[in-house]
Structures are given as structure tokens and as C-alpha cells.
């Protein structure tokens, strides 16, 4: 998930994966949607994420080819989910590899103009991340097989991600139960690509879309501090949010938008000139991070 002010194709991978799974009949019986939703009270188990080793490998610079193969061999740690997310992103990278960035400089309201050299360097880094992956590796049929195999071998993250594809058709209680489990995983990629997408809720009293946090509803149109804090949350959970490895930052730079060095720098730029806003956003982020780390994820409901 990215703040509403910035639309990135890289964080749409989970949605595409969910649609693919539904299309090939991979949404299975026996998911939490088929059982009575538990009323989660109190804290989740605050433990080290099962994917901790995968996160470290995912963050390493350079090609992710070997990572994909390693991840597919470890579905018990969420590896199938990680692998299919990489394949989805790299499919887009290779599809646009022949398109060079615009030669002229561009700028957004939160950044200095982006030079063509910066854009080309970011595009090169993206291609390096996908080096060694063939067109066959990235074919729909291969990704569908990886999803099916991951479900057969009980990848917990993939099962939750696919179940989230039905969130729009669930009761609010079941949707909250799923959100609780996703956040309680403590995994930065699962939270970024899936949990934060379904965390956007509708206030039943007003019909306004926004986020619940610490018992207060924050409308998207009125409070960007919450969305910016959520944008930083995966960073604190272990994701490399520098332009060396962050798909979102790299893609925006490659496409001629801002070339922020990190998500933290981007947030600071967005809030520049608004007294106290940056400090408030960072304080919210720290409380969110502490809640996930301690298992107190009910504060997001």
C-alpha cells in the first residue's frame, strides 16, 4: 500500500495474484471465510516472523533469481507467497525493459526534478533485480503452478493473501479477523501488499473511507499522517525501504517521478512546510510499529 497521493504499479502485485488465483480455481474450501469468525480480543502472539530469513534474502541487492528458487522450496515460511510476488513484479519489469525513460526532467510537488540519468539508473537496478529469470519463469501458467503448489504445501502467507481476495464479500467481522491475522504475522511484505490494502474500511455512520487506529477513525481525505505512517510500517518490520531495493521507489524514479533515497525521505518531503506534521506522523508510525511487534494489532480495528 502507498499513500493515496502516489499510485505505484509495484504494489498492485497482490491484487493481480488474487485475481489469477480466483481465475484458475485456487481459492480453496477450508479458509477462515468458511468457519465462524473468531472475535480476536487482546494480543496476538508476539513472535519472530516465520519469514525472517526470507526477508533478509529478499533485501539483498542484485538478482532475485536464486531467491525465487529458494523461496519456492520453503512454503512453510511463506516462500511461495514471496516467490510469486517477485515473479509478478519482474514480469512487469521485463515487459517494459525496452522502454527507456523520458529524456526530459520531470518533477512532482514533493521532489526536485528527476534527471534522465537517475531514471535510467533506477530502471537498470530493476532489471538487475530480475536478471536470470526467463520468460517461461514469468509466464502465467508457471505462476499459477507456483500458487497451486504453495497451497498444496500449506504456505500460510499465500493462503491468507488469496483469502483476502474475497474480503469485499465478507462480513465486517470476518474481514477484521483476516486483517488481524495478516498484521499478527509480522511479515513486512504480507502486511505491505495485502494487509494494508484491506485495512481501508468504510465508516458505517458516514460512508467515508479511511483507517481505524487506536479507537479513532481517520478519513483518507482528511488525514494523510495515518497513510504515510502505514507506508513506513513495512520498513520498521524489516523491509529495505531504500532506493537500492525498494520496488516502489525504484519504479517511480524509473518512470520520471520523484527519486527519493528512501521512504523516510519521501515522507519528510511530503510533509515539508507543515509545522509538526512530520513529528506527528513519525510518532504514529512508532506506535503502529510497537503494536505489530508486540502483537497488539487490535488497535488497527
Annotate each PLM feature:
Residues 2-15:
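N-terminal Sec-pathway targeting helices
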Residues 29-48:
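Ser/Thr/Pro/Gly-rich low-complexity linker/stalk segments immediately outside membranes or between
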Residues 72-80, 87-90, 94, 101, ...:
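Short helix-capping/linker turns of helical repeat alpha-solenoids
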Residues 12-26, 83:
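Hydrophobic membrane-insertion alpha-helices, especially the h-region
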Residues 242-243, 247-301:
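Terminal, low-structured helical/coil segments at or just beyond the last alpha-helical repeat
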Residues 52-60, 96-99, 103:
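Long, acidic/serine-threonine-rich intrinsically disordered regions with weak helical/coil propensity
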Residues 59-68, 173-175, 212-217, 223:
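Short linear interaction motifs
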Residues 49-58, 160-164:
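Alpha-helical segment of the N-proximal tetratricopeptide repeat
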Amino acid at each position: 500500500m502507498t499513500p493515496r497521493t502516489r499510485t505505484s504499479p509495484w504494489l498492485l502485485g497482490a491484487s493481480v495474484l488474487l485475481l489469477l488465483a480466483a481465475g484458475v480455481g485456487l481459492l480453496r474450501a477450508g479458509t477462515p471465510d468458511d468457519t465462524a469468525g473468531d472475535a480476536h480480543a487482546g494480543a496476538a502472539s508476539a513472535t519472530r516472523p516465520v519469514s525472517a530469513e526470507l526477508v533478509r534474502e529478499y533485501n539483498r541487492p542484485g538478482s532475485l533469481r536464486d531467491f525465487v528458487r529458494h523461496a519456492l522450496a520453503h512454503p512453510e515460511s511463506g516462500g511461495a507467497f514471496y516467490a510469486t510476488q517477485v515473479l509478478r513484479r519482474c514480469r512487469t519489469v521485463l515487459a517494459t525493459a525496452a522502454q527507456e525513460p523520458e529524456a526530459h526532467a520531470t518533477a512532482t510537488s514533493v521532489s526536485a526534478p528527476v534527471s534522465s540519468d537517475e531514471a535510467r539508473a533506477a530502471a537498470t537496478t530493476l532489471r538487475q533485480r530480475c536478471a536470470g529469470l526467463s520468460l517461461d519463469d514469468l509466464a502465467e501458467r508457471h505462476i499459477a503452478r507456483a500458487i497451486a503448489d504453495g497451497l498444496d504445501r500449506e504456505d500460510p502467507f499465500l493462503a491468507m493473501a488469496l483469502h483476502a481476495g474475497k474480503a469485499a464479500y465478507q462480513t465486517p467481522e470476518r474481514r477484521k479477523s483476516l486483517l488481524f491475522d495478516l498484521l499478527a504475522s509480522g511479515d513486512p511484505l504480507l502486511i505491505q501488499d495485502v494487509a494494508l490494502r484491506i485495512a481501508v474500511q468504510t465508516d458505517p455512520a458516514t460512508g467515508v473511507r479511511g483507517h481505524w487506529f487506536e479507537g479513532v477513525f481517520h478519513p483518507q481525505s482528511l488525514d494523510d499522517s495515518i497513510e504515510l505512517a502505514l507506508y513506513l510500517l513495512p520498513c520498521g518490520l524489516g523491509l529495505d525501504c531504500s532506493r537500492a531495493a525498494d520496488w516502489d521507489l525504484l519504479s517511480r524514479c524509473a518512470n520520471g517521478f520523484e527519486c527519493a533515497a528512501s521512504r523516510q525521505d519521501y515522507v519528510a518531503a511530503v510533509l515539508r512546510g507543515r509545522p509538526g506534521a512530520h513529528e506527528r506522523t513519525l510518532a504514529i508510525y512508532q506506535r503502529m510499529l510497537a503494536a505489530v511487534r508486540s502483537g497488539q494489532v487490535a488497535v488497527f480495528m
